[in-house]
Amino acid sequence: MLMLLVRGTHFENNWSKLIPPAPLDATVSEPPVPDSGEPDSGVPWRRSDEALRVNVGGVRRRLSARALARFPGTRLGRLQAAKSEEQARRLCDDYDAAAREFYFDRHPGFFLSLLHFYRTGRLHVLDELCVFAFGQEADYWGLGENALAACCRARYLERRVARPRAWDEDSDTPSSVDPNPDEISDVQRELARYGAARCGRLRRRLWLTMENPGYSLPSKLFSCVSIGVVLASIAAMCIHSLPEYQAREAAAAVATVAAGRSAEDVRDDPVLRRLEYFCIAWFSFEVSSRLLLAPSTRNFFCHPLNLIDIVSVLPFYLTLLASVALGGNNHGGTSGEELGHLGKVVQVFRLMRIFRVLKLARHSTGLRSLGATLKHSYREVGILLLYLAVGVSVFSGVAYTAEKEEDVGFDTIPACWWWGTVSMTTVGYGDVVPVTLAGKLAASGCILGGILVVALPITIIFNKFSHFYQRQKALEAAVRNSGHREFEDLLSSVDGVSDASLETSRETSQEGRSADLEAPSESPKPQIY
């Protein structure tokens, strides 16, 4: 039975579960080094059967020569077979000649998994390590992918191939829904920008109030008012499309500019017009306030939600400019045709008000998750469109061949594309239907093919949306909890907050955690493998 003789401090963490502790009465004895004479192996500086003392990241272990001899190609196997101290020093980071101990500045958790490899001959993947960090550790110790156990090899290779892609595409990894500390630290870095700014403390408070709905009671009230204004604007736009308002708009179109009034003044209902002005004033206030309070102007214009805010108010001001141009050109004798074209442009600008509904994404986790899903699912969307294009082309050609003699709307293959699209997506409006047996069989195949083809990418997109939603909720919870601790500390401090102070706090916290991990146990016991 393979025995690994171990002596040293006990590393209390989750990785120690890989190696079961030995009975308390287990003892280890090291063969004495002869006082004179050369060992049988011809190695002048240590015996060939002498146990190897190693210290990896503070974890001290003593490995038997017989265990290392089974794997001579590994780093420890080559270290055991080293012919001289100089050759051995090339394989380790440091060597203590007095204690005859080799030191390696490597990950201690992987070393415990390495001990398990020397005992069983199989290496298991550690979920605590990044796939690239695990690969680097395995390469350093001289282990290849063939050393991986069969239960972990497929998962390791899959993660290694998928890891270069963005973090949002690792939706199959359960831990990927946890909030990323870098994402939380981005908010801290944004707050630190106010340290050297003018009125930084006040701007910092106002910015957090507008950007973080869970920051304080005023921020929650501001969020509720903003949602109410967005809903009121959408309701006013919908009411304006009712028949009675359309009739009034048609009557206003007959009016000429000779009366000295703008068509907008005649067309719009006074109540709706006042409500529209109020909504525009509120939206303009939001955009200008966020622009003035933003810690970085460049980052402000790069944020998608801020661009949505700008687009929501842009149509109103463009329509206003068009109306001013319409009134000015009227006195200059503008023709009716030119006025008609300008009026169509105004209508397009008014139609752009529908984008105001996207402002709700600032207050909705689901909408933000949907936007992130669409942004990072372009591969799946491309596959979906490719499947639909192939299916529509094939079944449209079959339907055209079967129904071209009938007067049912299948006159050309491009005319059949509409029928193929609504059939493959299982919408089935019924405006165009086949009447022959061959056409009905083609329609049945089109519907069944659509169910099978469309369902595959949709499932992937849905899983990705679920992943994004869980991640967004976890990130919001982490930022909210961090707001109760770190944000309050920042706001109560002086304006001289800097990145250096934040870095010092992180280093202090890290030193405290390292001290807890590296603290030796009161009575370490040897272990046997």
Curated annotation (Swiss-Prot):
Q: Which residues lie on this side of the membrane: Extracellular?
A: 240-270, 323-342, 401-413, 434-440
Source organism superkingdom: Eukaryota
Q: Write out the domain note.
A: The transmembrane segment S4 functions as a voltage-sensor and is characterized by a series of positively charged amino acids at every third position. Channel opening and closing is effected by a conformation change that affects the position and orientation of the voltage-sensor paddle formed by S3 and S4 within the membrane. A transmembrane electric field that is positive inside would push the positively charged S4 segment outwards, thereby opening the pore, while a field that is negative inside would pull the S4 segment inwards and close the pore.
- Coiled coil ranges: none
User: How does it associate, per the subunit comment?
Assistant: Heterotetramer with KCNB1. Heterotetramer with KCNB2. Does not form homomultimers.
Task: Note the InterPro entries from the entry.
Answer: BTB/POZ_dom, Ion_trans_dom, K_chnl_volt-dep_Kv, K_chnl_volt-dep_Kv5/Kv9, SKP1/BTB/POZ_sf, T1-type_BTB, VG_K_chnl, Volt_channel_dom_sf
Please tell me the species this chain comes from.
Lemur catta (Ring-tailed lemur)
Location of motif Selectivity filter in this chain is 426-431
Quote the protein name from its UniProt record.
Delayed-rectifier potassium channel regulatory subunit KCNS1
| The entry's keywords | Cell membrane, Ion channel, Ion transport, Membrane, Potassium, Potassium channel, Potassium transport, Transmembrane, Transmembrane helix, Transport, Voltage-gated channel
So what does this one do?
A: Potassium channel regulatory subunit that modulate the delayed rectifier voltage-gated potassium channel activity of KCNB1 and KCNB2 by altering their kinetics, expression levels, and shifting the half-inactivation potential to more polarized values. While it does not form functional channels on its own, it can form functional heterotetrameric channels with KCNB1 and KCNB2. Each regulatory subunit has unique regulatory properties that can lead to extensive inhibition, significant changes in kinetics, and/or substantial shifts in the voltage dependencies of the inactivation process.
Q: What's this protein's family per the entry?
A: Belongs to the potassium channel family. S (TC 1.A.1.2) subfamily. Kv9.1/KCNS1 sub-subfamily.
